[in-house]
Amino acid sequence: MKKPTNYPTTMKQLKTATDIVSLCVIGLLTGQASALSLTLIDGSVGAVAAGNTLTAAVQAPASGINVDGSSIIYQGTAIQGQTQAATYTGFSLAPSSGSTPTLNLGDGIFLTSGSANIPPTNTTNSFSNALLQPGSGSNLLLTTLSGFNTNDANALSFDFTVDPGVTSVSANFIFGTDEFPTQSVTDIFGFFVDGVNYAKFSGGELISNTPNNPTNFISNPVGSGLYSIEYNGLTKAFNVVGILDSGLTTHTLTIGVADTSDSIWDSGVFIGGLKAGTATGGGGIGTTPDGGTTLILLGGALAGIAGLRRRLA
């Protein structure tokens, strides 16, 4: 399908638009390795360049989604030196011990409520990058979803069309947070298709650390070295499916995370593989096998880049 001419479709165009600068650093921990590579997006590149880069990176090859380039909206910090979002490759986190799963995810984007420049090990229970005020502000969809004021929102939104017969869109994600397991004021993730959020656990809980869903997270305690990543809590790799509004010819997708009520203790979502599909019913999330391919759909009844590319290990 032909994309609008103002939408960057080649790496040459993307590099020209965003001035990508990469520095690869590889590290290994004894008995454990990670190939997660982040290309950080500096706030100074501007919302247009950041939005174009993230929109291209979140989609699967031959996604079947025709993005209206003029509709792309990126919400994130605009301050030089602040890196709230990133693109990523090679997400594969193997546990150092025990029976917890290896977490694998296809390439995509990383949105956070603070900093995407996360440490390669879990060193603190309160990793936080309080964005220089006024930060990135609130997000109406996430505020309405959570029922609380939101701050430090990091969101990507765009309009798109699909071929006849397409009824859904889907993506694969892992949500991580340093709010787990102790905080009652928590961050939130939303995946909104035509205004409806489909990012819910199978029991209907929102994707956030709340007292009602501790079993939905894998614990990664400080000092345990279980996973080579900062966050205290991680979800499994999930596939989220959103059902398109059949009454619309142009659809809207919004992906976002935010702090609720405060501006501290970071969370983030790794998400990619966005593509069109033919699912019907209520949508929702389900687990994915290695590599981020859909295994089973659960919850059917649930209604410039001034980048540092590095490897976390």
Language model region names:
Residues 1-14:
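N-terminal secretory signal peptides that target proteins for export/translocation
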Residues 19-29:
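Bacterial N-terminal signal peptides
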Residues 31-35:
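Sec/Tat signal peptide C-region and signal peptidase I cleavage site
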Residues 36-286:
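Aromatic (Trp/Tyr/Phe) and Gly/Pro-enriched flexible surface segments
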Residues 289-308:
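A short, hydrophobic C-terminal helix/tail in secreted or cell-surface proteins
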Residues 310-313:
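Short, charged juxtamembrane terminal tails flanking transmembrane helices
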